From Swiss-Prot:
Gene behind the chain: KCNMB1
Ranges that cross the membrane: 19-39, 158-178
Zinc-finger is among the record's keywords: no
Changes after translation: N-glycosylated.
Source species, domain of life: Eukaryota
The family this protein is said to belong to: Belongs to the KCNMB (TC 8.A.14.1) family. KCNMB1 subfamily.
Entry keywords, A to Z: Glycoprotein, Ion channel, Ion transport, Membrane, Transmembrane, Transmembrane helix, Transport
Self-association and partners: Interacts with KCNMA1 tetramer. There are probably 4 molecules of KCMNB1 per KCNMA1 tetramer.
Reported function: Regulatory subunit of the calcium activated potassium KCNMA1 (maxiK) channel. Modulates the calcium sensitivity and gating kinetics of KCNMA1, thereby contributing to KCNMA1 channel diversity. Increases the apparent Ca(2+)/voltage sensitivity of the KCNMA1 channel. It also modifies KCNMA1 channel kinetics and alters its pharmacological properties. It slows down the activation and the deactivation kinetics of the channel. Acts as a negative regulator of smooth muscle contraction by enhancing the calcium sensitivity to KCNMA1.
Expressing tissues: Abundantly expressed in smooth muscle. Low levels of expression in most other tissues. Within the brain, relatively high levels found in hippocampus and corpus callosum.
Molecular-function GO terms, alphabetical: calcium-activated potassium channel activity; potassium channel regulator activity
Membrane topology designation: Multi-pass membrane protein
Ion transport in keyword set: yes
Name used for this protein in its record: Calcium-activated potassium channel subunit beta-1
Organism: Homo sapiens
Length: 191
C-alpha cells in the first residue's frame, strides 16, 4: 500500500512537471513570436507625442492613383489638420498610412460601395462636429503625418506581453512547487 502511494505521488509529480515545462515552453515560443512581430511594429511607430489637432479640411475621394496605378474603387476620407504648430495629414492608425497614403480613413468593408460611403460620411461628420481633438504626432519636426489612434503603443505592447508572462510565471511556479514537494518528501523519508 505504501508503494502504491509513492507511485501515485510520482505519477502526479511527473504530470505536474510536464504541465509546468509545457507552459514554460509555450511562453517562450509566444515571446519569440511577439518579439518578431509586435516589437518591430512598436519600434516603427514614431508617433509618440500626444498633441491637439485642429481640423483644416476634409474631403472624400472615390478613386485614387498611387504611383500610376489605380487602386480598387472605394471611398476614402482625406483629413488635413494643424498639429503641434504645423500642417499635417491625419491618418486613422499606422496601418491606414501603410495601406494607402492618400487616405486618412479607409472604411472597414470596401466590398459594398454604398455601405463604405455611408461609413466614411459618418466619420467625416464626426470630424466636422469636433474641430479640435487629440492626436499623436512625431516628436521630430520633419514628419508631416499624425495619427488619430495608435495601434502599436505601449499599452498594446504590455497587453501582448501579459499572457505569455502569466503563462511563464504559472509554469515556473508549478515546477517550483513540485520540486519543493519532492525535496520535502525526501527530507521526511530520511527522518
Amino acid at each position: 500500500m505504501v508503494k502504491k502511494l509513492v507511485m501515485a505521488q510520482k505519477r502526479g509529480e511527473t504530470r505536474a512537471l510536464c504541465l509546468g515545462v509545457t507552459m514554460v515552453v509555450c511562453a517562450v515560443i509566444t515571446y519569440y513570436i511577439l518579439v518578431t512581430t509586435v516589437l518591430p511594429l512598436y519600434q516603427k511607430s514614431v508617433w509618440t507625442q500626444e498633441s491637439k489637432c485642429h481640423l483644416i479640411e476634409t474631403n472624400i475621394r472615390d478613386q485614387e492613383e498611387l504611383k500610376g496605378k489605380k487602386v480598387p474603387q472605394y471611398p476614402c476620407l482625406w483629413v488635413n489638420v494643424s498639429a503641434a504648430g504645423r500642417w499635417a495629414v491625419l491618418y486613422h492608425t499606422e496601418d491606414t498610412r501603410d495601406q494607402n497614403q492618400q487616405c486618412s480613413y479607409i472604411p472597414g468593408s470596401v466590398d459594398n460601395y454604398q455601405t463604405a460611403r455611408a461609413d466614411v460620411e459618418k466619420v467625416r461628420a464626426k470630424f466636422q462636429e469636433q474641430q479640435v481633438f487629440y492626436c499623436f504626432s512625431a516628436p521630430r519636426g520633419n514628419e508631416t503625418s499624425v495619427l488619430f489612434q495608435r495601434l502599436y503603443g505601449p499599452q498594446a505592447l504590455l497587453f501582448s506581453l501579459f499572457w505569455p508572462t502569466f503563462l511563464l510565471t504559472g509554469g515556473l511556479l508549478i515546477i517550483a512547487m513540485v520540486k519543493s514537494n519532492q525535496y520535502l518528501s525526501i527530507l521526511a523519508a530520511q527522518k
